[in-house]
């Protein structure tokens, strides 16, 4: 039976993706919720594989957004603003990407620019699963996002929504969200600044009355990631980069 999964925020941790890829069958579908690049050493390789893999539905994250924003300037020798990308872990990506021919870099930029900001999956239980990188406050309608001109920034950068309640409107009664972007320790402590715990007992976090699930385990710091079954939101598989953990696996 075909399965549908979601994972997110692998940040160049290729060994984790390799495990996920081998775990999933050829006929499965994998929603990747953004942030393949930056911080870790193999972000470019990971992005290329995700774009090529027919099982993967790739959704843009804020780090893909930063890449497509700054790389065109870097190719022209303009380094204004580059420090912002570096602060967000972009140096490893640029050092790797700059080794490729410019034609291929431009091709990759075009492919990343095409990535959607969100997707909706109706699972086998009839639940409507809204998938995006950062998650969002569903109390805002799409039209309100358009009027504010911030739809893309909200869907890939927003963290304020973690304080919002699920909409009471009848049309949202069967809607759920799965997202990444905010590492679970941040969300648990209601911190909007980087905060990472050790990976012991670090798991995907269901919150907002069970309507939202955060699957970002901060894998660059914890070497642990989550793969959630979108047809059974209680079924989450965890993967570890044992090499990064020094051979020690955490529960």
Predicted regions located by residue number:
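N-terminal active-site segment of His-dependent metallophosphoesterases
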Residues: 1-49
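Active-site-proximal beta-strand elements of phosphoester/diester hydrolases
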Residues: 3-11, 128-135, 213-215
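Active-site neighborhood of divalent metal-dependent phosphoester bond hydrolases
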Residues: 43-47, 51-121, 125-127, 164
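His/acidic metal-ligating clusters that form di-metal
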Residues: 104-189
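Acidic, His/Gly-rich catalytic cores of divalent-metal-dependent hydrolytic chemistry
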Residues: 164-251
């Amino acid at each position: 039976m075909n399965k549908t999964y979601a994972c997110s925020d692998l940040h160049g941790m290729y060994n984790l993706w390799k495990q996920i890829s081998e775990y999933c069958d050829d006929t499965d579908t994998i929603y990747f919720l953004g942030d393949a690049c930056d911080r870790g050493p193999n972000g470019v390789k990971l992005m290329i594989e995700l774009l090529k893999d027919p099982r993967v539905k790739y959704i843009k994250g804020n780090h893909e957004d930063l890449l497509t924003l700054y790389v065109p300037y870097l190719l022209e020798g303009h380094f204004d603003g580059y420090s912002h990308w570096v602060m967000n872990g972009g140096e490893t990506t640029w050092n790797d990407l700059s080794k490729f021919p410019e034609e291929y870099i431009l091709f990759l930029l075009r492919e990343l620019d095409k990535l959607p900001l969100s997707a909706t999956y109706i699972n086998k239980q009839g639940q409507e699963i809204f998938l995006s990188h950062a998650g969002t406050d569903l109390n805002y309608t799409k039209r309100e996002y358009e009027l504010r001109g911030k739809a893309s920034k909200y869907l890939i950068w927003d963290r304020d929504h973690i304080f919002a309640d699920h909409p009471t409107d009848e049309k949202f009664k069967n809607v759920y969200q799965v997202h990444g972007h905010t590492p679970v320790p941040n969300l648990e402590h209601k911190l909007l600044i980087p905060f990472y715990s050790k990976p012991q007992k670090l798991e995907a976090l269901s919150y907002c009355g069970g309507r939202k699930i955060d699957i970002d385990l901060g894998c660059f710091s914890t070497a642990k990631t989550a793969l959630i079954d979108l047809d059974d939101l209680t079924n989450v598989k965890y993967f570890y980069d044992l090499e990064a953990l020094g051979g020690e696996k955490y529960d």
